[in-house]
Design a protein with these regions (language model features):
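A hydrophobic alpha-helical transmembrane-helix feature that marks the membrane cores
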Residues: 1-227
């Protein structure tokens, strides 16, 4: 199989052709995003059903990080498609033990459904806003990256500090950062900043994945399920 960048669409000089190219990338991205999210949901469900041990979930998360680099390396070839499904499937399975904990709580299934619904509402609302306004949100990039780095460092520190209030604050901050990244990544596709729909899918998938996890944490805390 040739490594020709068949999954990228270069922007043309003609504005009309450039718009058509961006629309094609966006359409392909949404199709692939829907399929990978469905596959993640399937592997997460299987993980919950077999009661996957937390240690195995940690191993899968590490494997997922490795596969993330593989996806980016192979995104310009046909190998990128099986790579992205491997990545999203592994990451979906890795949250099985976490979901099992939430599902075992009072109103656990309701909380998970609320988090899913909230994630969908945020994603579709922000995507629609970016698509309808055609605003360029590239200016958010530096701010969002800085905020994400600070949040990750604080999360690592809180593993040892174990401060509940900090954990809650970080989840709220990450929800806002992911919302901003949805605007940023969608805007990049619209304006031709991202022409590879596999890479575009990975970006939006990660935004949705993290948005769901931290929204679920917030819902559990505010409904008394996660003290």
């Amino acid at each position: 199989m040739s490594d020709k960048p068949v999954f990228s669409t270069a922007a043309a000089m003609d504005p009309a052709a450039s718009i058509a190219s961006s629309n094609k990338v966006l359409s392909n991205t949404y199709w692939l995003l829907g399929l990978t999210l469905a596959f993640s949901a399937l592997t997460a469900t299987i993980s919950v059903a077999i009661n996957m041990p937390p240690m195995m979930a940690l191993v899968l998360m590490i494997v997922g990080f490795v596969l993330l680099f593989v996806v980016h390396k192979m995104a310009d070839s046909a190998k990128g498609l099986p790579a992205i499904f491997a990545f999203t499937g592994v990451w979906g399975a890795s949250i099985g033990p976490m979901l099992s904990v939430y599902l075992a709580m009072d109103n656990g299934p309701t909380m998970v459904l609320q988090a899913l619904g909230g994630t969908a509402l945020v994603f579709f609302s922000l995507s629609a806003y970016a698509l309808n306004t055609k605003r360029d949100f590239s200016y958010l990039g530096g701010f969002l990256l800085t905020g994400l780095i600070v949040a990750v460092v604080a999360m690592i520190a809180n593993i040892f500090l174990a401060i509940p209030a900090l954990s809650l604050t970080l989840s709220a901050v990450i929800v806002m950062i992911m919302a901003g990244l949805i605007l940023f990544d969608t805007s990049r596709i619209i304006h031709g900043g991202e022409t590879n729909y596999i890479r575009a899918t990975v970006g939006l998938y990660l935004n949705i994945f993290n948005l769901f996890i931290h929204l679920l944490h917030l819902i559990a805390v505010f409904t008394g399920g996660d003290d």
